[in-house]
A protein has these predicted regions:
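Aromatic-rich peripheral "rim/lid" segments of glycoside hydrolase catalytic domains that contact
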Residues: 324-399
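Catalytic domains of carbohydrate-active enzymes, especially glycoside hydrolases
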Residues: 74-96, 298-308, 343-345, 349-352
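Active-site mouth of glycoside hydrolases
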Residues: 27-222, 227-237, 362, 374-388, ...
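Active-site region of glycoside hydrolase catalytic domains
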Residues: 151, 155-290, 297-320, 348-354
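Short loop/turn segments at secondary-structure transitions that flank enzyme active sites
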Residues: 43-45, 263-265, 359
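Short conserved micro-motifs at the rims of enzyme active sites and ligand-binding pockets
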Residues: 48-49, 267-271, 324-326, 365-366
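Structural motif corresponding to alpha-helix initiation and N-cap regions
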Residues: 73-77, 158, 295-298, 336-339
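Bacterial Sec-dependent N-terminal signal peptides
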Residues: 1-23
């Protein structure tokens, strides 16, 4: 009898140890992301015919078709496979929940919607890809960083994340949760007030508290919190970003800070500059923000947050496609150089990076398309893929 009890005890201990090892810290999670991709303009769409800025919480007519409301086709397993086969091993899935709520008082999620999200997560995990699930374009939350709305919004956010965490809690630690997105005053992307920052901090703490309270795999799940508007400047230099308090025993080990990096915007987002970086100054005007600026900024992230045990997630980044006639090839070569630099420098510091892909193609502002979802996931921005792969290779070299 004693022998049997001892065997049972040893087996229990073995499984407990295995379980502990399976729970990766946030920094381990991020370091294992060679390249991440955003499934943009898909599950964060408003319902067909619904105002994208609406703060209404409910389930309007046609909500089940929100996935295609902004012109992108239905996501299939082939969509995920194409991303995997191109060299990405992580996907961020931005999700709008507010138009899929069956009971606003309880923030209950439509079974059809949550089952669809699970289906896409399952496809990602089948290819052993990491996943970030977030809340994005929740206008009732993101557009009201004010004390007048703080208590009500935190209550709703807690209910929403309780429901998400319970539904997705069975997933292993390849799946991470991100609490909010780009919280900001409407039409104002500039410096926040102390009030705005305080509300963002409250959102972050609410998110961490409620997810941990759901127990199980969520006790040590990788949780990602945000600076105001996901602009790290407002966390690094205002001094008002508060690291949420995790449960006892976790420290900061299972938490990351998220930022979005379209820097400099005049090159990466609006396309006012056609060249970036020291080697390309000979070909035309370049923005003042260059490689040194990027490296110094990344080092600041390490000293401010990485040194405290937090992971760093660049949840969105990208370069709009913009070019001029005969210089198009060289300008695309420059985009490759930017991608290589960012991915290399980020990976050297253990950051994870998730490039934004909105399936928009053309020449101008915010043309962040990489894979053409309307043409069987054909790679149209191969210069972007090239730069990312070069960055991965560069980061593997001894420093």
């Amino acid at each position: 009898m004693k022998t049997k009890l001892r065997i049972c005890w040893l087996l229990t201990l073995m499984f407990a140890v295995m379980s502990c090892h399976a729970q990766k810290t946030a920094r381990q999670w991020n370091s294992e992301v060679t390249a991440g991709w955003n499934l943009g303009n898909q599950f964060e769409c408003s319902a067909p015919g619904q105002d994208g800025e609406s703060m209404d919480i409910g389930e309007p007519d046609g909500a089940d078709n929100a996935e295609t409301a902004w012109g992108n086709p239905v996501v299939t397993k082939k969509t995920i496979k194409a991303v995997h086969d191109a060299g990405f091993n992580a996907i961020r899935i931005p999700i709008r929940w507010q138009c899929h709520i069956t009971n606003p008082a309880a923030m209950s999620i439509s079974k059809t919607w949550i089952d669809r999200i699970k289906e896409v997560i399952d496809w990602c995990l089948e290819y052993d890809m990491k996943v970030i699930v977030n809340v994005q374009h929740e206008k009732w939350l993101e557009s009201r960083p004010f004390y007048a709305n703080k208590e009500e919004n935190c209550r709703k956010l807690a209910l929403l994340w309780m429901n998400i965490a319970n539904e997705l809690g069975k997933y292993d630690d390849r799946v991470a949760f991100a609490g909010t997105n780009e919280v900001h005053v409407p039409n104002n992307w500039g410096k926040p007030t102390a009030e705005n920052l305080d509300v963002q901090n409250a959102y972050n703490q609410t998110f961490v508290d409620i997810v941990r309270a759901t127990g199980g795999n969520n006790v040590k799940r990788h949780l990602i919190v945000q600076t105001y508007v996901c602009n790290a400047d407002f966390g690094l230099y205002n001094g008002d970003f508060v690291i949420p308090k995790d449960i006892e025993g976790n420290g900061n080990d299972y938490m990351s800070v998220e930022l979005h990096f379209y820097n400099p915007w005049e090159y990466a987002g609006s396309g006012e500059y056609y060249y970036w970086g020291e080697p390309y100054k000979q070909y035309g005007k370049t923005p003042q923000s260059d490689e040194t600026t990027m490296v110094n900024f990344f080092d600041k992230l390490v000293s401010e947050w990485g040194s405290k045990g937090l992971g760093i997630v660049i949840g969105e980044w990208g370069i709009t496609d913009h070019y001029k006639g005969s210089e198009a090839d060289r300008m695309h070569e420059n985009v490759s150089y930017y991608c290589k630099t960012l991915v290399s420098e980020a990976r050297k510091r253990g950051f994870s990076t998730f490039i934004w892909d909105n399936n928009r193609f053309g020449n101008g502002s915010e043309m962040f398309g990489i894979f053409d979802r309307n043409k069987n996931m054909a790679i149209k921005a191969d210069w972007v893929i090239k730069g990312i792969k070069e960055g991965i290779a560069e980061s593997a070299k001894p420093m």
